[in-house]
Amino acid sequence: MERIKELRNLMSQSRTREILTKTTVDHMAIIKKYTSGRQEKNPSLRMKWMMAMKYPITADKRITEMVPERNEQGQTLWSKMSDAGSDRVMVSPLAVTWWNRNGPVTNTVHYPKVYKTYFDKVERLKHGTFGPVHFRNQVKIRRRVDINPGHADLSAKEAQDVIMEVVFPNEVGARILTSESQLTITKEKKEELQDCKISPLMVAYMLERELVRKTRFLPVAGGTSSMYIEVLHLTQGTCWEQMYTPGGEVRNDDVDQSLIIAARNIVRRAAVSADPLASLLEMCHSTQIGGTRMVDILRQNPTEEQAVDICKAAMGLRISSSFSFGGFTFKRTSGSSIKREEEVLTGNLQTLKIRVHEGYEEFTMVGKRATAILRKATRRLVQLIVSGRDEQSIAEAIIVAMVFSQEDCMIKAVRGDLNFVNRANQRLNPMHQLLRHFQKDAKVLFQNWGIEHIDSVMGMVGVLPDMTPSTEMSMRGIRVSKMGVDEYSSTERVVVSIDRFLRVRDQRGNVLLSPEEVSETQGTERLTITYSSSMMWEINGPESVLVNTYQWIIRNWETVKIQWSQNPTMLYNKMEFEPFQSLVPKAIRGQYSGFVRTLFQQMRDVLGTFDTTQIIKLLPFAAAPPKQSRMQFSSLTVNVRGSGMRILVRGNSPVFNYNKTTKRLTILGKDAGTLIEDPDESTSGVESAVLRGFLILGKEDRRYGPALSINELSNLAKGEKANVLIGQGDVVLVMKRKRDSSILTDSQTATKRIRMAIN
């Protein structure tokens, strides 16, 4: 206050004012400071000072022809004095107002297209809803977040090539547009920006915003998707938060969210198959997310999540070097350890073989709702500083850290046997056994941990075994802090290896990820996920398995038909029939299979009994290992819609209904596709197999390879011989005629010859 009075006093003297306004600044150091380099040293002062002048703006000389000297109010818009040191005109801010109101209007059609990201943002904010402001302590942790909603996921190099091609198509320089997304975007943008008058540089900048993911390491307390980050300044302060619901979606957030769901589903499914790694790759390659191949998204998308990283590792991509345990991401910040196998006894005297980490290490632990700093020595927790959203989240972090510490008192706190299994019914490894055990109930663990007196430290409190805070006492080594622990900021990626059981290791052999770490949380994807792999048919339940199995048979009928007659065992072992088995009651699977296989064999043996519809209907039942029995069935049961439903061996049922006139197949009332029966199959006359342009030589001859379908015959050269499958599931040897003139006679001779060849 005194200082202000003193200053006021000084300013009231005219001499002070004169010194401050008239004296030149001639101290070289000061002049240097404010004039060297292009960077403005005091932007706000500069702005205020400029705006206090009459003509703070300079413009090209042409302005004098386009803007009048005075506006309607008679105010001067530009000065006749030219700008010192350039041939530009000095202009008043009023000229800008005049121009905005009265200047020429250009074609605005390109503005929403070029400035798409801004227009979209306005729409999102217009439709977003802001809720009440709450005052409370904000636990913010720095996370790497996407700050640029609505972008495609191109790499900087890919985007650069697209931008050059769109904005400067005639510039020299090799541009290689290879990826699907590059080509699509280039084509789209070239069409949109035809005859665009906006400066090319501006267009290039705006395109970059649209094409490339920009990330920043920012303190965040709430949602981390880009739609929340764009309003970060409105939704969280140091001591307040404002609720916000975004208006609309942005493609990149939807891709990230759907990718995580797809990856989790795929890893969970692969883990229970016979060869997890091969299955995982097959599924990643055959899945699409929002119409884009999942493998393409994985290559471009930097999302770090356990399941996503397992998929990336399987594809040979680099991933972050941090590891995952109990749903927390651990990053070692100092220290080192060596691993040694050790046998320990639980409180129930069960022997566990654990890999002990010997040595002092420090880690940061970052989870969805809690973060911590952990310092540990060999089988001893030295200190854990944890912060989280609520008591529950803090407890989760403490349990994970206690198990990770491998302390003896933790192992002795186990009550009862440890026999947790994964989805494939295999026992979990000891560390995950312990984790699951204490996640179910940590009472004994916390009670046995031990308690200590604590000194009061700013921003830290103790926590008792029942999770109540205390300033006097705390569980040994454990404190709760008001401050969050920042996520690991580096974007460094390392080369990793993955084994058959989807365990991901770094170059030193440390396990970074395993299927046990994949979250069980279910969510609804925002973009359509299309799993083409039969392994994922069961994700939408039994009905989906049923429909998909039959659709697959119909789509591949030409090849299925050949295998049915030539190599049935190979057909029965196809993985596409695997999901179907879960629908057939376990006790009777084998009998059904034996019955159907026998029936099929009779069809192969007895001329004229081949029945497309029946083969399709019964084929999935033949895939189970058959039990030989004399049982005959008139209907087969499948478990769908919560109960057993019947498929009739002869004739239609609600489950499997084939309409002969429309040739449509419906499964449980859902359309499953059109079935093309072999011509004249109903009359089972040999004429259905008449092959115009081919001479029938006799019975099948294995030397000429596997049987072709009638459609494949067209590829034969004249005079070439081949085995061919004809309407009744019979195979004959044919030769393509050398002359076309004799085609007419084929119909007469074929009938006789087929009869001879078969009998």
Swiss-Prot record:
Entry keywords, A to Z: Cap snatching, Eukaryotic host gene expression shutoff by virus, Eukaryotic host transcription shutoff by virus, Host gene expression shutoff by virus, Host mitochondrion, Host nucleus, Host-virus interaction, Inhibition of host innate immune response by virus, Inhibition of host MAVS by virus, Inhibition of host RLR pathway by virus, Inhibition of host RNA polymerase II by virus, mRNA capping, mRNA processing, Viral immunoevasion, Viral transcription, Virion
Site for Mammalian adaptation, residues: K627
Motif (Nuclear localization signal): 736-739
GO terms, molecular function: RNA binding; RNA-directed RNA polymerase activity
Compartments in which it is found: Virion; Host nucleus; Host mitochondrion
Any Pfam family the entry gives: Flu_PB2_7th
Primary location recorded for the protein, binned into one broad class: virion
SUPFAM superfamilies cross-referenced by the UniProt entry: PB2 C-terminal domain-like
Intrachain S-S bonds: none
Biological process annotations from GO: 7-methylguanosine mRNA capping; cap snatching; DNA-templated transcription; symbiont-mediated suppression of host cytoplasmic pattern recognition receptor signaling pathway via inhibition of MAVS activity; symbiont-mediated suppression of host gene expression; symbiont-mediated suppression of host mRNA transcription via inhibition of RNA polymerase II activity; viral RNA genome replication
Record family assignment: Belongs to the influenza viruses PB2 family.
Subunit structure as annotated in this protein's UniProt entry: Influenza RNA polymerase is composed of three subunits: PB1, PB2 and PA. Interacts (via N-terminus) with PB1 (via C-terminus). Interacts with nucleoprotein NP (via N-terminus). Interacts (via N-terminus) with host MAVS (via N-terminus); this interaction inhibits host innate immune response.
Function: Plays an essential role in transcription initiation and cap-stealing mechanism, in which cellular capped pre-mRNAs are used to generate primers for viral transcription. Recognizes and binds the 7-methylguanosine-containing cap of the target pre-RNA which is subsequently cleaved after 10-13 nucleotides by the viral protein PA. Plays a role in the initiation of the viral genome replication and modulates the activity of the ribonucleoprotein (RNP) complex.
Protein name: Polymerase basic protein 2
Species of the source: Influenza A virus (strain A/Memphis/4/1980 H3N2)
Gene name tied to this protein: PB2
